[in-house]
Amino acid sequence: MTSPLIEFVDFSFKYRAQKNPTLYDINLSIYPGEKILIAGPSGSGKSTLGSCLNGLIPFNNQGDITGSLTIGGKKPESVFQLSEFVGSVLQDTDAQFVGLSSGEDIAFALENKVCPQAEMKARVLDVAKLVGADGYLRHSPQRLSGGQKQRISMAGVLIENTSILLLDEPLAALDPSTGKLAIELIDDIAKKTGCTIIIIEHRLEDVLWRHIDRVILLSSGRIVEDSAPDKIVISENLDAVGIRKPLYISALSRIGVDVTVAKKPGRLDSLQLTDNEKEKVRLWAKAASVNSALASDKYNESTTPLLEVKDVGFTYAETETDALRDISFKLYPGEMTAIVGANGAGKSTLAKLIVGFEETKTGSILYNGEDMKELTIPERAERIGYVMQNPNQMICKPMIFDEVALGLRVRGISEPEINERIERVLSVCGLQRFLKWPISALSYGQKKRVTIADALVLDPKIIILDEPTAGQDWRHYTDIMEFLVSLNKLGVTVLMITHDMHLCLEYARRALVFSDGRLLADKPAYEVLSDPVLAAKANLRETSLYDLARICAIDDARTLVRAYNEGGIGG
């Protein structure tokens, strides 16, 4: 019988600065060549468990350990020793780069081992080809897209022929199409190298796009389930801990189709439905289509637009490339609109132009009918709240309370009102128990929620959020989005830049689709998410509802997608 490559026995860990353990009584065996998904909500202990595997715990982040952990049959002795077994790809790939070029970054570990240059070049090229990164070895890592950066990071750890590849939230910063390619790449690496793959991620459905042996579900530092995908996707434990079930599972459940392990529901392409069950889905979609036939997709155009972008163009001086070309659209009070498209499509550049971080080269941006060209950044900030994609680029105070209070204090708000506002917004963002914590103690996803709180606490008329749910588990995702919905119902215009097609489908009535600096489409969200041609052009990915419609022989997949978009299927 094969011995475990990784084995936790009655393992618990407590950070020295914390009162209670972060991990409790972990008993887990992982065998050579397995592909494992570790899933759980924010704060469940996923990242801490990963840090135990790569040696950051206890050698960098010290604490109290009980029980045992062996890797390769040995007790970890140092980070250096573990690096021979475990290669880690961080969630924030920028924090991992050390070389001036991508090739130099991949070669870093070999340089430290004084590897002969000819051998080094050959090995760098081989591993770059393995991950599909051989076309940009001379490029600076900082100039690459999110997906390209991830490939360079993978190559940098695979070059040491490690037995274990550990990936911390590999999908967090990727557009849907690139995320799909990342999962395919990880699957390809597993097949070609035979290494053990451990993925830490809460986006269950996206990871299960390709084969996974087991899913380890964590909550409050404990393993609550260790199951195969066919069992985990229908487990009530997902609802209990706050992890989203796959969209097609939720749809089938609401329609009244009984999904069991025997139907092989772990992946949509393995799902086995009877003819009667497929007919049930078709009849439901038809009924939902009839019920919504009189509904209008028009948004309110009876008032002056709150924000109007007119023929806007922008070129980055250092590259002389057109980041945006002839962009025009209107936003009306109370709209909730998504901006979608590939990495590098111009979505974030547009947001920077609206808030004044960059100046338009052509065209104009109007707020309530008035050109904002002469407004300063602080003046624009009084009208439009902005939440960046990377929280580390926004946070400037060491303590959470002071960080969220900063915008209020510079505006002269009284301390009692500051306390009241902060308590309310931290509660909504799921951060109330961290009120007096230092920022440094938070996870990446928790920092993201702090920056959303920074914007929400000022009660702006427009909120622009760049990837508002990146790094969030389903429970916090839902809390944040429902809070945005409540603001939206009060007339606050919400503009969301997102890669999350579930978010677009569930919360956006309208979607602006960008590709290569152009606005390809301005349509209802359900139309965008049921148009494979448009999805391919913009590096999007149709939701699993589209594929479910195809499996059930629904002629017009939009009927099922629209039903979900309009609330016919519960989230």
Identify the meaning behind each predicted range:
Residues 118-136, 405, 416-434:
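Conserved ABC ATPase "signature" region
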Residues 222-248, 518-545:
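Conserved beta-strand-loop-alpha-helix hinge in the C-terminal portion
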Residues 62-77, 363-371, 380:
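Conserved ABC transporter NBD signature motif
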Residues 165-168, 463-466:
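Catalytic Walker B motif of ABC-type/P-loop ATPase nucleotide-binding domains
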Residues 74-87, 372-385:
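ABC ATPase NBD coupling module
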Residues 140-144, 148, 438-442:
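Conserved ABC ATPase signature
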Residues 54, 355:
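Helix-to-loop junction immediately C-terminal to a conserved catalytic motif
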